[in-house]
């Protein structure tokens, strides 16, 4: 089976590419290359790659493709607020355009990496479910993901299976690591500085999931019967996969023996708190999605990865692992223009 994977040179994509190839899939990666050189360790390189903006994909790029896993886009709320219009152009309109092109060219399945951010600020007394919970997207990133989901689902039919997966905040090692996401940030802070400072009171809730379990979810969208996954959305997480920031910080501290954990409480309670229900993916896709990673295993993996790669505070706080810093660096150095188009092949 030939898989076109957009965002193959990103945080999740670098891991997913390796897993797909190990499983015998033929992978074509499509990525604009903004983060291609932001590497720790050795990402897999021996596969077919196109360096191209997803806004520019054309029919010949899809020749012989059976399924698309669409990860590419501006990857979180801070990046989304960099330019709300561009966020909509890329994450919403670019996604819908690609899905339409896929359907026109006989692609059988379209798997979309969506987001739980579309739920917005919510009450924590009830876990958020895929269909019944209100969608209240606040940021440009969240709005774009929600708008794209609705549009591409309208394209689904018996011959074009559309599935949307909404991952929890991801953690875990990757050759293109991100440290602008909560658990990776906490473990990296403990490892490089010897301490973790939490400015809130630690009570906000955050669902998190390991990058390899997220990859497993996307692959389940390739192999599960269309009757289960077509025109449907799935929250991606693990059993009991909602944690307070205090839980996450304690797990990070435990991953780095000797590190110090301090709750300053100076910002009080964070309004960004939510809990998510994972019953659908854990029951309906249980034959295909079998999460294997918890916080302590993931924390141990991160520390081992840091030791193997010579990870330091310069990586943790710099553009190697902070996506918005890299994007600003590319613009400041005239590598890309203000529409996030490449000015030079030397990225």
Residues covered by each model-derived region:
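NAD(P)H-binding glycine-rich loop region in Rossmannoid oxidoreductase-like domains
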Residues: 54-90, 101
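C-terminal substrate-binding subdomain of Rossmann-fold SDR/epimerase-dehydratase oxidoreductases
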Residues: 194, 199-347
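N-terminal Rossmann NAD(P)H-binding glycine-rich loop of SDR-like oxidoreductase domains
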Residues: 3-23
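Conserved glycine-rich Rossmann-like NAD(P)H-binding loop of the short-chain dehydrogenase/reductase
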Residues: 25-34
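SDR active-site strand-loop-helix element
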Residues: 6, 30, 68-71, 110-116, ...
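NAD(P)-dependent short-chain dehydrogenase/reductase
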Residues: 150-206, 211-220, 250-255
